[in-house]
């Protein structure tokens, strides 16, 4: 049987293994129907260096499940990464399609100074 969630997790596992091999910081994205989350994780995978999500108090008052909210999260994660001294990351889309909210977050992070 084809399981949509299992297929997404399989894709995510392969991507994370490759990023760990590269040994660079990764920008990981997780989305739910209502919120979107982004984290910068250290190369060894043991430490979250920066995070942003639609649960942050500055974004929570508006709509949280659309591309505009994802753009705001992308801007916020780029600012927090630069404050932590990180400019180059690998993009881990967690097996989600590069489309819609995931794409909006990635493009906003690039426009605000993160290099993928």
From Swiss-Prot:
Keywords: Ribonucleoprotein, Ribosomal protein, RNA-binding, rRNA-binding. The keyword Zinc-finger does not apply. GO terms for biological process: translation. The keyword Ribonucleoprotein applies. GO terms for molecular function: 5S rRNA binding; structural constituent of ribosome. InterPro entries: Ribosomal_uL18_bac-type (IPR004389), Ribosomal_uL18_bac/euk (IPR005484). GO terms for cellular component: cytosolic large ribosomal subunit. It comes from the Bacteria. Belongs to the universal ribosomal protein uL18 family. HAMAP family: Ribosomal_uL18_B (MF_01337_B). NCBIfam families: L18_bact (TIGR00060). This is one of the proteins that bind and probably mediate the attachment of the 5S RNA into the large ribosomal subunit, where it forms part of the central protuberance. Part of the 50S ribosomal subunit; part of the 5S rRNA/L5/L18/L25 subcomplex. Contacts the 5S and 23S rRNAs. This is Large ribosomal subunit protein uL18. The gene is rplR.
